[in-house]
Amino acid sequence: MKIGVFDSGVGGFSVLKSLLKAQLFDEIIYYGDSARVPYGTKDPTTIKQFGLEALDFFKPHQIKLLIVACNTASALALEEMQKHSKIPIVGVIEPSILAIKQQVKDKNAPILVLGTKATIQSNAYDNALKQQGYLNVSHLATSLFVPLIEENILEGELLETCMRYYFTPLKILPEVIILGCTHFPLIAQKIEGYFMGHFALPTPPLLIHSGDAIVGYLQQKYALKKNAHAFPKVEFHASGDVVWLEKQAKEWLKL
């Protein structure tokens, strides 16, 4: 099966990595809207338009399924995209909620949602979690992580300063952290290390990763099984510099 993966830039590599490892598909077309990243600071109308333009990009490629790897687009553009599409389109929020349901049985467990400003303001995660009965949900817009990750700053003083700025004021320490932006799994170990080092938690918080969550979701919903004989072919496209995007992919995905 040939599918598409759409993201605002390189953040979708975290989803792509999980898809490649799972080997559920024969061919993957990756489109990063890198000329207009970040999405998280833009208004809902603009994000919806970007989503519809992404659909136009994928039409000639004749894909059978589209994965919206961007949380902001999943929160604000997914429904509009589905209305204008003849193929299934899957976002990353519903799979993450399914992963929570499967792994977190305590409805009072403190859950922290990290995301871009646009994703957090949409309340998509908060509303979905409350519909499932989770009562102790907080959220935090951590948009500055995105440009750091886009610049391949995955460790060091700048990232540490950014984490300190966002996390120091927290009043309730989470047992579960939803990485509500597909960029964030690229610094997941640093986030976990910060919480363990600065808050002396007895156990590491459970990190919900969009990529792993979506693989489980696809296997369950579409009865997909691993193709043991072939590694998926990947083709990269970008609204910006595709050579740069391919270079980042080789570094991060070890292609």
From Swiss-Prot:
Uppermost EC category: isomerase
**Family as reported in the entry's similarity comment:** Belongs to the aspartate/glutamate racemases family.
**Which pathway is this protein engaged in?**
Cell wall biogenesis; peptidoglycan biosynthesis
* Taxonomic lineage: Bacteria, Pseudomonadati, Campylobacterota, Epsilonproteobacteria, Campylobacterales
**What keywords would UniProt list here?**
Cell shape, Cell wall biogenesis/degradation, Isomerase, Peptidoglycan synthesis
Per its record, what are the GO molecular function terms? glutamate racemase activity
Question: What residues does substrate bind to?
Answer: 7-8, 39-40, 71-72, 182-183
Query: Which reactions fall under this protein's catalytic activity?
Result: L-glutamate = D-glutamate
Query: What job does the chain carry out?
Result: Provides the (R)-glutamate required for cell wall biosynthesis.
Source taxon at top rank: Bacteria
Q: Which organism is it from?
A: Helicobacter pylori (strain P12)
Positions of the catalytic residues: 70 (proton donor/acceptor), 181 (proton donor/acceptor)
Q: What is this protein called?
A: Glutamate racemase
GO biological processes: cell wall organization; peptidoglycan biosynthetic process; regulation of cell shape
Q: Which SUPFAM superfamilies match?
A: Aspartate/glutamate racemase
EC code(s) of this entry: 5.1.1.3
> What gene does the UniProt entry assign to this protein?
murI
